[in-house]
Amino acid sequence: MAKADYNKRKPRKFGKGARRCIRCGQYGPIIRIHGLMLCRHCFREVAPKLGFRKYE
């Protein structure tokens, strides 16, 4: 096998690397509820615009 063959990877089907944030592209903590697909950092920024409210 050539070295170039090692760089070709099949797309991930499950796990953290399978989903990206649609806003910033981060792979880590994704919020998928209601089909949001946002990382938690982006979700905290846009949550008020989406209609989410913080209750005490």
UniProtKB/Swiss-Prot annotation:
Q: Which UniProt keywords apply?
A: Metal-binding, Ribonucleoprotein, Ribosomal protein, RNA-binding, rRNA-binding, Zinc
**GO MF term list:** rRNA binding; structural constituent of ribosome; zinc ion binding
Subunit composition?
Part of the 30S ribosomal subunit.
Protein residues bound to Zn(2+): C21, C24, C39, C42
Example GO BP:
cytoplasmic translation
Ranges that cross the membrane: none
> Coiled-coil regions in this chain?
none
Encoded by which gene? rps14
Q: What does this protein do?
A: Binds 16S rRNA, required for the assembly of 30S particles.
Entry-linked Pfam families: Ribosomal_S14
Question: By what name is this protein known?
Answer: Small ribosomal subunit protein uS14
Can you quote the record's cofactor note?
Binds 1 zinc ion per subunit.
What family, per the record?
Belongs to the universal ribosomal protein uS14 family. Zinc-binding uS14 subfamily.
Tell me the cofactors it needs.
Answer: Zn(2+)
Q: Keyword Signal on this protein?
A: no
